């Protein structure tokens, strides 16, 4: 049975043809919210998101605010590892945190290379795949052109930085695209589009004086994705779609700042029905204006039609970090209207022999959910295991119970290391946000921007990492230092612990 998901703005498109069997209409938003949405007004930011009527929103630069923004804007489902908020249920395709070893390219921080997506159940038993990313901003191609670099130099810089970042991400999505699964990727790519910088459009803006084959958007196109805004607005001159920047904040502009379309919604195996640019009032390229505009980026919105794919076995625990004495929500799905259940086991434990608590024999119902207590679950790492009616494991996801004080703990493997040696550190109770990180600071320096080395935690709640010498800006001289657990690519200190470097 065809159905439309939630968004009144989509339902109001009276000119849209009737949906074919199995098709679903979706409204999607991509929004760089500028350091958590607090630089102008977070309430105004939330109002913009509410007004969009989007079913799914990909946020960039949320700085630990994703869950709070979702709650305030009325979005019940949140993916903290991808910074996606949704009106439809979200399920991680693997275990809920990064299991790959080592540091990942920036857009894959907190994610496994073979699972950059999250499943969104847009119809009973049927899903699409979602991704959301933010590519590195420096060196910025339009700035290089402005400052005199040639096109070959710019393409070389793009290839070295952003193409290197998008390559493994696109490669991780390509198998889904090849299977015919609808895949939607939102993001701030920090790169203009090869579809915009053409010979025909050369000179249409003062800052666009050359034609240039921007490689990042070419790579997304090669992976099977369509640029939703340009598909809806092929006239480059009439609708340039400049997403950066309306101001810092609007209406303040920085003289000489390079403006371009760098925020995108890419869609594969989907039909683009329309796209909009939201931003400041009075701009003829903006479809809807708000005063004040709450970000240094404009927002991109796309109306899409998809035919979702049959869902695999799915399991989610919310929240992933559960206070001792609290409760957590478990959501599950088994294909084929199968009876299902969930068993809670210690991390990596056997569901047949190590179950601490369980709920089993559930009647199949779409998005069936139940609450469990942490009674009997000591602080530490746990797994929820999805089972069928025979008790066979079908899926598994990770969560952790944190002590009653709710505070993360950071512990070095040794309180003293020699100059040039790696530093190993463990942590428990991290929030599991995409860009949580651990930094090294000089003891006594209160400036949290002065980190001497850093590495992302992989969005792991309880884990261990080794800060190897290649991660340091300079070799640490003998002296006293501090390790700090920091939140989501920002500077809120969650935990810290001292260590000493000796000769």
Where are each of the predicted segments found?
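Extended, solvent-exposed regions of the mature portions of secreted/cell-surface glycoproteins
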Residues: 312-503
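Active-site-proximal beta-strand elements of phosphoester/diester hydrolases
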Residues: 25-35, 127-156, 297
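Metal-dependent phosphoester-hydrolase catalytic domains
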Residues: 21, 175-182, 191-313
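Surface-exposed cleft-lining segments at the edges of enzyme active sites
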Residues: 103-106, 145-163, 202-205
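His/acidic metal-ligating clusters that form di-metal
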Residues: 129, 158-189
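N-terminal signal peptide c-region/cleavage motif recognized by signal peptidases
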Residues: 15-17
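Structured beta-strand-rich core segments of catalytic domains in phosphoester-bond hydrolases
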Residues: 56, 60-144, 276-279
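N-terminal, active-site-proximal structural segment of metallo-dependent hydrolase catalytic domains
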Residues: 3-6, 10, 19-72, 127-128, ...
């Amino acid at each position: 049975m065809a159905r439309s998901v939630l968004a009144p703005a989509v339902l109001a498109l009276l000119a849209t043809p009737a949906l074919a069997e199995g098709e679903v209409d979706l409204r999607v938003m991509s929004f760089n919210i500028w350091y958590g949405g607090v630089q102008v007004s977070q309430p105004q930011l939330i109002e913009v998101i509410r007004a969009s009527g989007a079913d799914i929103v990909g946020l960039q630069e949320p700085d630990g605010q994703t869950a709070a923004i979702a709650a305030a804007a009325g979005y019940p489902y949140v993916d903290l590892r991808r910074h996606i908020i949704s009106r439809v249920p979200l399920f991680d395709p693997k275990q809920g945190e990064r299991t790959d070893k080592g540091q990942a390219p920036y857009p894959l921080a907190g994610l496994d290379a073979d699972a950059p997506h999250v499943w969104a159940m847009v119809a009973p038993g049927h899903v699409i795949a979602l991704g959301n990313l933010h590519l590195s901003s420096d060196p910025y191609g339009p700035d290089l052109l402005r400052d005199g670099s040639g096109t070959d130099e710019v393409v070389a810089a793009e290839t070295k930085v952003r193409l290197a970042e998008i390559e493994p991400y696109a490669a991780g999505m390509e198998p889904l695209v090849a299977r015919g699964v609808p895949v939607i990727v939102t993001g701030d790519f920090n790169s203009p589009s090869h579809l915009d910088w053409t010979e025909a459009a050369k000179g249409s803006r003062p800052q666009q004086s050359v034609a240039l084959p921007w490689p990042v958007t070419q790579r997304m196109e090669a992976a099977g994705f369509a640029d939703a805004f340009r598909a809806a607005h092929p006239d480059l001159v009439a609708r340039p779609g400049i997403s950066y920047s309306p101001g810092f904040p609007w209406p303040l502009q920085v003289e000489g700042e390079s403006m371009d379309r760098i925020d995108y919604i890419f869609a594969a195996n989907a039909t683009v029905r329309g796209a909009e640019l939201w931003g400041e009032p009075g701009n003829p390229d903006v479809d809807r204006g708000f005063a004040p505009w709450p970000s240094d980026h404009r927002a991109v919105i796309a109306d899409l039609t998809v035919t979702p794919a049959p869902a695999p076995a799915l399991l989610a625990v919310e929240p992933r970090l559960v206070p001792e004495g609290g409760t957590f929500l478990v959501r599950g799905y088994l294909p084929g209207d199968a009876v299902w259940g969930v068993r809670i086991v210690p991390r990596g434990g056997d569901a047949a022999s190590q179950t601490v608590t369980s709920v089993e024999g559930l009647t199949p119902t779409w998005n069936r959910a139940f609450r469990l207590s942490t009674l009997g679950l000591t602080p530490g790492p746990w797994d929820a295991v999805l089972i069928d009616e025979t008790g066979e494991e079908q899926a598994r996801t990770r969560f952790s119970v944190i002590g009653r004080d709710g505070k993360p703990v950071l512990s070095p493997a040794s309180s003293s290391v020699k100059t040039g040696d790696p530093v190993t550190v463990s942590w428990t109770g991290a929030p599991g946000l995409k860009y949580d990180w651990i930094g090294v600071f000089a003891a006594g320096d209160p400036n949290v921007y002065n980190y001497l080395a850093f590495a992302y935690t992989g969005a792991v709640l309880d884990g261990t990492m080794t800060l190897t010498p290649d991660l340091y800006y300079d070799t640490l001289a003998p002296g006293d230092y501090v390790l700090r657990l920091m939140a989501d690519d920002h500077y809120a200190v969650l935990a810290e612990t001292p260590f000493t470097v000796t000769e």
